[in-house]
Amino acid sequence: MDAAVVSELLRALIRRDGDAVAAMVTDDFAFEPLSTEAAARGVYRGGEGMRTYLRDVGETWRQFDLTVSAVEEVAGHVLVNGRVYARSRATSLVADDPVAFAWRVADGGVAWGKVFTSEAAAREAVQRRDGGV
């Protein structure tokens, strides 16, 4: 079940366990996080890319908490809804916002993930990737 794989990945991300995250993604994995006013982010690739992402998060945010409220399989993807609470290391910026993820699992590993500011945007992206279903 793809949702179980993604749920395990999210638990590892919440723990900031780079080795566990790297072990769960495919070699050609691509992760597209959101850029914020605290930091611009590009695409992170593969297991080493996710280790770098977690280091970048730690360098940017004094506190970074992800809460997951729902995980659902949709059109060959896994949608996740939740909330991010983060406090910048460099400024007084506090982010307390809803967040949604779209993930794709292939061959038992997570092959793609992208972060969105809303569930609607994540659903729309999944439908576009799936050919409009």
Regions found by a protein language model. Give the residues of each.
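A solvent-exposed, acidic/Ser-Thr-rich amphipathic alpha-helical stretch
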Residues: 19-20, 26-75
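Short beta-turn/strand-loop junction motif enriched in small, turn-promoting residues
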Residues: 18, 32, 85-89
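Generic anion/oxyanion-binding catalytic loop in active/binding sites
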Residues: 10, 39, 111
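A beta-strand edge to alpha-helix "cap/lid" segment located at domain peripheries
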Residues: 1, 55-133
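Short, low-complexity N-terminal intrinsically disordered segments enriched in polar/charged residues
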Residues: 1-27, 124-133
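Residue-level detector of alpha-helix boundaries and kinks
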Residues: 5-6, 35-38, 88
